[in-house]
Amino acid sequence: MRVVLVHPTGSNWIPGRKDISATANRMAPLGILSMAAWLGAAGTDVAVLDFLGPGAPVGIEAQTRSILAGKPDMVGISATTSSYLDGYELIIKVKRQVPQVR
């Protein structure tokens, strides 16, 4: 099984508020990194995509392509309040293109 774990980008989706999401969420995604280590030790083929990290693809379409390039059987999203909408949109796009992905 191939698992891709994703740390999505995000933004302030409240109109009129300053957007500090990229700064506030710029941290190592320790939760999915821990899960990846455990899954890898158990023999699962796992990848972590940190879309807030350096060199990450920009935009939902490019990020969806990046996820699908890993040919996942399962995709996991780790999201905060500011990134859950991007995470949700990524999952919708992945499932539309490859419905059998869990």
Task: Place the predicted regions along the sequence by residue.
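A short, structured N-terminal alpha-helical element that caps or precedes a catalytic domain
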Residues: M1-R102
